[in-house]
Amino acid sequence: MRMPSAISIGVIAGLSVAASAVPSLQKNGTTCTVIPLGNGQDDVPNILSAVDECGQTSGGRVVLPAPYTYRINQRMTTHLTDSRLEIGGTLLFSDDIDYWVNNSYRVDFQNQSSAWRITGHDYVVDGGPRQGGVDGNGQLWYTWAKGGSNVFGRPMPVHVFESTRATLRNLAIRQPQFWAVLVDSSSHINLDNFYVNATNHDSSVSPEGEWVQNTDGIDTYRSDHITVTNWVYQGGDDAVAFKGNSTNIHVENVTVYGGPGIAFGSLGQYPDRTDIVENVTVRNVRVQPSFQRAMNSGVYFKSWIGVNYGVPPNGGGGGHGYVRNVSVENLRLKDVQLPVYIDTCLSYLFSENITQYCDTSTYEFEDLHFRNISGNGLATVTDYPGKNISFAVALLCSEKAPCTDLTFQDISITLPGNYTGKHVLCENAEAEGLPCNS
């Protein structure tokens, strides 16, 4: 498997001007090939026509060949059945912020939105050997949303929605506007060999470095039997995140450069919803800092406070549910601030006195198993409501819902030689194989 360099975002280059003698939509049997119109013209109508002609026929192919760049100037739903969408080129989203804010598809979570929905069944989306894919034109969004978290209107470029038995592979997503990929209300989806890079070049956006919030690699939501393999993520936010009602998930061979790593959450934000994350395996993950951002954690779990305080996307809480039957194996750490932790006092209303609610969550974490975790932590102070924590492992569970049946085996996390504090913190947690509070 060949991946782009982890220290360079690369250059999205491609031909956006088509020869005038070449028709923009060519059909040969059940194969439809789209050539871009060029000159900034919208290629969505021709792509959708190709999908209608060849993407809903058994064995059909829709081909967007390299090295072309296709302008995506409007929201797009590609409904595929028993067919293939081959993206050798690059889908470049337009810079019309007003259009996207007002016209993107709405997502039933944190008032979010998406620009491209992929729906259907028994389909393949393939970027080919050169890893074609998406350029989200993200920098203009990073600058536009600076100073805010979860700013309304930033659309996700790839939204797998109401799909079954599908494979997405060999895709590169550069400069996503928001989360790069959302798998939502879908089942039996395989996502293999992805490269995601979100790099901020505007120093006024983030004083911490060349990263920006809400540029996750992939999030799962209300989905079952999802496989994520052979990913490289470089950005600064969650590489992989499991949102509510993500079940039977397998993640393997993921390399992360910068950010919080693998996230279970956030969960329990909505008081009228039950969030379940169950039967999850995370295996063979490597995490280390990037030039964009430090490596905040390797794997972490986050649930909202137990009272409904404020409104989503940055406020809320009081939701119910559980994370259960989780296995994290073969996690390699390099220069990680807080390698493993559980946080049950989540809120993004940073100016409010949230600490008073830190033991109110009834969200449950149980049957979590960690094996073969090694590398080094930095023991740098990490802010947590009401305290500063600096450990290899911190299990900060709620008094109302203690964490139970947690096991740790073959854990070897070294901290700096001049560090004299505790290595492990356990609050309201039962952890076998871990020297709690030592």
From Swiss-Prot:
The stretches annotated as PbH1 repeats are: 186-222, 223-244, 246-266, 277-303, 323-344
Entries under Pfam families matching the protein: Glyco_hydro_28 (PF00295)
Query: For this chain's UniProt record, which GO biological process terms are given?
Result: cell wall organization; pectin catabolic process
Q: What class of enzyme is it?
A: hydrolase
Q: Name one GO molecular function term.
A: galacturan 1,4-alpha-galacturonidase activity
The protein's UniProt keywords, in alphabetical order, are: Carbohydrate metabolism, Cell wall biogenesis/degradation, Disulfide bond, Glycoprotein, Glycosidase, Hydrolase, Polysaccharide degradation, Repeat, Secreted, Signal
Q: Which reaction does it catalyse?
A: [(1->4)-alpha-D-galacturonosyl](n) + H2O = alpha-D-galacturonate + [(1->4)-alpha-D-galacturonosyl](n-1)
For this chain, the family text in UniProt reads: Belongs to the glycosyl hydrolase 28 family.
Task: Tell me the protein's name.
Answer: Putative galacturan 1,4-alpha-galacturonidase A
Gene this protein is translated from: rgxA
